[in-house]
Amino acid sequence: MRELCLSSELYPVSPADIAALADTPADLQQHVKDEITVLIGDSQSGQTDTLLSGRDAVRRALAENASSVPVRFAFFSKIGRFDFITVFVKPLRARYKIFSSNIYHIAPLEIRKLKIERNIRTKENAYVFSNSLFYYDEAERKRQYDELYNSMKRGYDDNFPLDVMLLRMMGIKDTVNQGHHRMGIAIECKLPLVAVRFSAAGAAPRILQPLLKVIADINITLKLWNKNK
């Protein structure tokens, strides 16, 4: 049986986004504990996202005009079950990366509550990178930030979704992979929703997961503290 990996977080997604999905084919079905679970496909190979569990719950949410439903995202690992290296090394992991076929609408403040951002971007620290190859002077930083701000202040463009990678950090914790500046501006502009595309590759070996979860939580806390103090 293929290894089914689950997101570390539950995401409050617009129920209309989930209702639009077809049910997961019988040959890919696996038992899951969460009421609503979406199995992401692979946009590059034409595999579509499907609803693994929770059709009735989604219908109820639509009938009740609920603004969101809690969704667990799942994927089949592209990395071998006993591969103890690839999931921890970004260049290796990138070879196996898949992207969801659909985008999903989530309130940006709800994403922030999940504590999955690796950096909190504001006007003050926009386009400041530790890598000197990506150095921008003050004028260029301001220009780029203002350009992005002006393009977003009237609404979020779904053509530029955030990339949230499932189990990105140490194969155990979801994090925002791309889109930190968009997240910051969406919150600054009080946008109700942002578009999110999920990506994935693999998960840490199960025997290591309890320890790695503790390390990952400490890691992201320290990363945010160091970058935003």
Predicted regions and their residues:
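Non-Sec secretion/translocation targeting segments of pathogen effectors
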Residues: 1-4
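Glycine/charge-rich catalytic "coupling/switch" loops of P-loop NTPases
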Residues: 7
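Short alpha-helix boundary/capping and kink motifs at helix termini
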Residues: 13, 19-53, 58, 62-65, ...
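A short, basic-hydrophobic beta/loop patch
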Residues: 37-51, 55-91, 96-97, 158-218
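Active-site-proximal loop/hinge segments that shape catalytic or ion-binding/gating pockets
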Residues: 88-118, 122-123
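Conserved double-stranded beta-helix
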Residues: 212-213, 226-229
